[in-house]
């Protein structure tokens, strides 16, 4: 599908599927977003393309967009695996039916006033999660060429959609590679995007899995994304993928021997370095954060309140991982929560009100 066809389809859909504008109490306002100053977008990660399903991935759910908008949120980050729409034997061969699911999400975002943030969670040559990619994005030209090809395709496909409705988040949580290596890769991807759409808002995750700002990217005219998972003893208690089963039950503030990790620790170690980056003309957003469902609920909410207060003070938006699931406000399966029945889901009302506060 070319860009003109896509824009025609979404325009036609808008006639038949238009919904009344939803008053949005949390919606970011002010001037159009720029890489140097992002709106305080707030919302959730939606996981329909997070990993490739053997039987095929479903489209994004309109009910998610309606719920977010009704609650007053205005941001959806879509962490995606390139394998959802690519032949694993030919990374440059794209499957149009899967890509149309992304088109559908873009249109749902338009209808419900939700900004769409596309993210390659699994890119050709890199993913923070297993299994390991067959090539290494940081070393292999073939992987970098394929990754640039995918971003160029998205840039061309969605050219004309303004950046207040859509942004690109290049790579999820790059590891502790040398900064020069990361800058080289990001520069290549940004160049591929701008050859197709010079106006697209682009965001890069911080290094060391999103935790560290990257000053070497400040001259590229892109924003950066941080994380809200520190300390992981709180956010990932009993999470098997980080070997959290053996950790002691957390408190907040967290006691680590003679050290206490609290709100002021977060301010000093996780907020101030990024505020210093902002002084270089780089906008900041928290692309992921959340607390796994084994952490006691009272501890979870206390941790969330402190992070939210710090981000509000900094003027940063955020996207909770996730809307539905073990970190989310819906269907999280916590044992210490009295859930509310809500549109076919189990709602953690107390967490929702903390997020909306």
PLM feature spans:
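N-terminal export signals
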Residues: 5-25
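N-terminal carbohydrate-binding accessory modules
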Residues: 27-75, 276
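Acidic/histidine-rich helix-loop elements
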Residues: 46-60, 89-93, 136-139, 235-263
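Surface-exposed, active-site-proximal loop segments in enzymatic domains
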Residues: 53, 82-99, 124-142, 330-336
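An active-site-proximal structural segment forming one wall of the substrate-binding cleft
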Residues: 65-73, 94-120, 132-166, 186, ...
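Active-site region of glycoside hydrolase catalytic domains
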Residues: 141-260, 269-292, 313-319
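Aromatic-rich peripheral "rim/lid" segments of glycoside hydrolase catalytic domains that contact
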Residues: 296-357
């Amino acid at each position: 599908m070319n860009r003109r066809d896509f824009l025609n389809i979404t325009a036609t859909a808008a006639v038949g599927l238009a919904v009344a504008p939803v008053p949005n109490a949390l919606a970011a306002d002010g001037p159009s977003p720029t890489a140097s100053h992002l709106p305080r977008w707030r919302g959730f990660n939606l996981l329909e393309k997070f990993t490739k399903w053997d039987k095929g991935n479903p489209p994004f759910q309109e009910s998610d967009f309606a719920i977010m908008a009704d609650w007053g949120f205005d941001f959806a980050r879509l962490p995606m695996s390139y394998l959802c729409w690519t032949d694993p034997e030919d990374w440059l061969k794209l499957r149009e039916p899967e890509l149309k699911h992304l088109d559908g999400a873009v249109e749902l975002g338009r209808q419900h006033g939700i900004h769409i943030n596309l993210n390659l969670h699994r890119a050709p040559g890199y993913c923070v999660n297993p299994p390991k990619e067959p090539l290494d994005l940081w070393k292999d030209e073939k992987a970098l060429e394929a990754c640039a090809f995918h971003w160029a395709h998205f840039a061309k496909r969605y050219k004309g959609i303004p950046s207040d409705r859509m942004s690109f988040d290049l790579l999820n949580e790059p590891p502790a590679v040398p900064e020069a290596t990361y800058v080289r890769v990001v520069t290549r991807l940004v160049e591929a995007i701008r050859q197709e759409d010079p106006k697209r808002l682009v965001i890069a995750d911080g290094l060391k899995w999103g935790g560290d700002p990257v000053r070497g990217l400040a001259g590229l005219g892109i924003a950066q994304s941080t994380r809200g998972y520190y300390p992981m003893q709180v956010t990932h208690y009993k999470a098997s993928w980080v070997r959290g089963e053996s950790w002691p039950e957390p408190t907040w503030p967290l006691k680590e021997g003679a050290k206490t990790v609290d709100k002021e620790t977060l301010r000093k170690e996780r907020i101030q370095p990024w505020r210093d980056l902002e002084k270089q003309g780089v906008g900041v957003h928290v692309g992921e954060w959340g607390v796994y469902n084994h952490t006691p609920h009272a501890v979870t909410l206390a941790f969330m309140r402190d992070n939210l207060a710090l981000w509000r003070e900094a003027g940063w938006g955020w996207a909770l991982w996730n809307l539905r699931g073990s970190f989310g406000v819906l269907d999280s399966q916590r044992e210490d929560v009295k859930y509310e029945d809500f549109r076919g889901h189990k709602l953690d009302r107390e967490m929702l009100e903390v997020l909306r506060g």
